Amino acid sequence: MTDTAVKKSAESVKMPENGKKKHLSWQVIACVCLVAVSVVLNVIAWKSTAFCDWYTAHVFPIWENTYGRLTSLLPFSFGELLIAVAVFGIPLSLVAMLVLVIVRKGKRKKTAKIFGLVYMWIVTFVVTVQTFNCFVLYHCSSFAELNGIPTEQHTRTELEALGNKLVTEINALSKEVERDSEGKFVLTADLDKTAQEAMRGLGSEFKNLGGFYVTPKAIKCSFFMSQMDLMGIYFPFSMEANYNQDMYKAKLPDTICHELAHTKGYIQEDEANLIAFMACDRSDNADYRYSGYLAALGEVRNKIFDYASDDKKIEFDSSICDEVWADMEANWDYWRSVDEAKDTVFDSEAVGEISDKAMEKSLKLNGVEDGKQSYGRMVDLMLNYFKDKGEL
């Protein structure tokens, strides 16, 4: 063999390694670029409401109509699977990496590099998806601004008028739904197509609410959701509207519509509450109408009770019929049973406290200054909504 032949042979052996290095470097570049784009989008989102409105109307629907359609085909919550993989898979992979680094002495650098790339892609995926499917949405114009609903301060008299209106409606609706031998609500409606139709029906009047809707998915490990005080959750990593199947069933239709509102870009909790109420209120299904009014009554009742005298509280509560009270108390009993549950994998009080702090922190980091208290702003939105319609 000649010297030239030997050199060519050596080069042919080295080329795959060089090629691999180039491949790895491109992965790093790709991740850095995606994270950089995410950072830029977040900066623009905080600075420009107009950009966020444009993004929500024209770009965000692309993810729903592609990725959302794909995950909707699955008969289970893909988001729940991703959480399971993250909770169990990542710690196990760290253990596997340490074992391989110890055992494969001659390939420690290569092993660390492979696992490093995997973790780098995971971080990139989280940052990018959270930005595209969640963070930007927090900085849009409000639902009221987008849809021409006036915003103004309201008197206690108007609040009490709204409360009385809700009581009148829900008392009548309570006679239209099925009940068991104990007088408690029995769900007869489906939790997917009816919810999608109810939400889609708002599309002709309100921006961004028409078109395709993802399929709502029940969470298998719903008790853990209950420990976190969650009735539903929009999961941006799977573009899914997930719900707690263990909770009291009268609350499910409204909860599902609430999560579907998030998949249309309305990420603020108070706005999703209002949208869910409107969808349920306009639904042809009695279960949905009842669920919407039950959720709304709870919010308005809490607002009235913030200032009302004992006599006024008694007067208001006495106007609510026995059937509605049966459902309100059954709902409270469920959440109380979760708090008092024994022999659970995780302590309910500890899980609830961690979840509450995490939610509060997340909301404030995304510009929601009053954190979880923002949920209660739904009452102000309802007052504006009904007043704009001339019904208050």
Question: Language-model features: where?
Answer:
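Pan-zinc metallopeptidase signature
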Residues: 329-392
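Auxiliary, metal-adjacent structural segments of Zn-dependent hydrolase domains
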Residues: 178-245, 249
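Post-HExxH zinc-binding segment in Zn-dependent metallohydrolases
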Residues: 166, 267-315
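Cytoplasmic juxtamembrane regions at transmembrane-helix boundaries
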Residues: 13-14, 20-22, 95-120
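Transmembrane alpha-helices and immediately adjacent membrane-cytoplasm interface residues
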Residues: 90-95, 110-144
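Membrane-interface segments at or immediately adjacent to transmembrane helices
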Residues: 135-203
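Active-site recognition of the HExxH zinc-binding catalytic motif
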Residues: 75, 252-273, 277-278
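Membrane-embedded alpha-helical segments of integral membrane proteins
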Residues: 37-100
